[in-house]
């Protein structure tokens, strides 16, 4: 049996870090939404063997236990004593190490797909609980749509989708270590976004307020260390984006744009100096088990 599943990227419309917890994780409060930039995950059952095989044409995708999709398959096999293998083919469209949860989305898609392939009968809530053991963003990626994420990111409260608009993304040719960004974050010196106000703006579909309220506390670290990220932000604003923000720990920057003509201007302007530029829409729907 063979299954093909989309694994969409996410952006953070608002990201706040509240404090460092005794368990070493950071308590966060953030609004995330999925966008129409997605990897493709293909699962092929291997009933005659017990292996997990990762295949990808992208040389930056690990084919062993470092891969979150591999970890998702291994977790299901061990939890439910599955005695058959699976080949996981990953076609990458989401940039790697970009702050867009590409690896987490691959893991979430693998959980959803293997739930069907192996006929486990798990609910999305049960899959999200398993996903949280793999990574903080995996639980959100199991559900998709738009949500308020709290705890270390694994406590998911769905909220309505934002009003439709274009999302233009640009990633500079650098990688950013999420762990290093958190290590260098000085919470007493940063400006904290109003996440609750963002939720209310989304609930009343107030595009102008959403644009005013975007905020990411991690910018305080990444923009200082990587001036190319700050440069992309400046250029995106100059070209006319309605709101501009770094996603996650970076380095990808996104702009929200309401009108087609302005989106084209921003997209074309960024293509002049940045190789990885995308123009996509937000995804309104949460994932289903069908």
Swiss-Prot record:
InterPro entries: GHMP_kinase_C_dom, GHMP_kinase_C_sf, GHMP_kinase_N_dom, IspE, Ribosomal_Su5_D2-typ_SF, Ribsml_uS5_D2-typ_fold_subgr. Gene3D superfamilies: 3.30.230.10, GHMP kinase, C-terminal domain. It catalyses: 4-CDP-2-C-methyl-D-erythritol + ATP = 4-CDP-2-C-methyl-D-erythritol 2-phosphate + ADP + H(+). Signal peptide: none annotated. GO terms for biological process: isopentenyl diphosphate biosynthetic process, methylerythritol 4-phosphate pathway; terpenoid biosynthetic process. GO terms for molecular function: 4-(cytidine 5'-diphospho)-2-C-methyl-D-erythritol kinase activity; ATP binding. The active site is at residues 10, 137. Coiled coil: none annotated. Pathway: Isoprenoid biosynthesis; isopentenyl diphosphate biosynthesis via DXP pathway; isopentenyl diphosphate from 1-deoxy-D-xylulose 5-phosphate: step 3/6. Keywords: ATP-binding, Isoprene biosynthesis, Kinase, Nucleotide-binding, Transferase. It is an enzyme of class 2 (transferase). The keyword Nucleus does not apply. Pfam families: GHMP_kinases_C, GHMP_kinases_N. SUPFAM superfamilies: GHMP Kinase, C-terminal domain, Ribosomal protein S5 domain 2-like. ATP binds at residues 95-105. Transmembrane segments: none annotated. Its EC number is 2.7.1.148. HAMAP family: IspE. Belongs to the GHMP kinase family. IspE subfamily. Catalyzes the phosphorylation of the position 2 hydroxy group of 4-diphosphocytidyl-2C-methyl-D-erythritol. NCBIfam families: ispE. This is 4-diphosphocytidyl-2-C-methyl-D-erythritol kinase.
């Amino acid at each position: 049996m063979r299954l093909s599943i989309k694994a969409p990227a996410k952006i953070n419309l608002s990201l706040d870090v509240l404090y460092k917890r005794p368990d070493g994780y950071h308590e966060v409060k953030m609004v995330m939404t999925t966008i129409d930039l997605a990897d493709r995950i293909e699962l092929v059952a291997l009933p005659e063997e017990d292996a997990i095989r990762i295949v990808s044409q992208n040389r930056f995708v690990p084919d062993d236990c470092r891969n979150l999709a591999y970890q998702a398959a291994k977790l299901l096999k061990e939890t439910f004593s599955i005695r058959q293998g699976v080949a996981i083919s990953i076609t990458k469209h989401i940039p790697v190490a970009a702050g867009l949860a590409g690896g987490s989305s691959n893991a979430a898609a693998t959980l959803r797909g293997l739930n069907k392939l192996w006929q486990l009968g798990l609910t999305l809530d049960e899959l999200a609980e398993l996903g949280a053991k793999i990574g903080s963003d995996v639980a959100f990626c199991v559900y998709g749509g738009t949500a308020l994420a709290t705890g270390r990111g694994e406590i998911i409260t769905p909220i309505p989708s934002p009003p439709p608009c274009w999302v233009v993304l640009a990633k500079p040719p650098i990688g950013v270590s999420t762990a290093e960004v958190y290590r260098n974050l000085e919470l007493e010196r940063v400006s904290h976004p109003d996440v609750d106000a963002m939720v209310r703006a989304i609930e009343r579909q107030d595009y102008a307020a959403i644009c005013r309220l975007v905020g990411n506390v991690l910018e305080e670290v990444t923009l200082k260390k990587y001036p190319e990220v700050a440069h992309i932000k400046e250029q995106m604003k100059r070209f006319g984006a309605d709101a501009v923000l770094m996603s996650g720990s970076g380095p990808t920057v996104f702009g929200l744009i309401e009108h087609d003509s302005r989106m084209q201007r921003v997209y074309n302007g960024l293509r002049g100096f940045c190789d990885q530029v995308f123009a996509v829409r937000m995804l309104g729907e949460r994932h289903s088990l069908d």
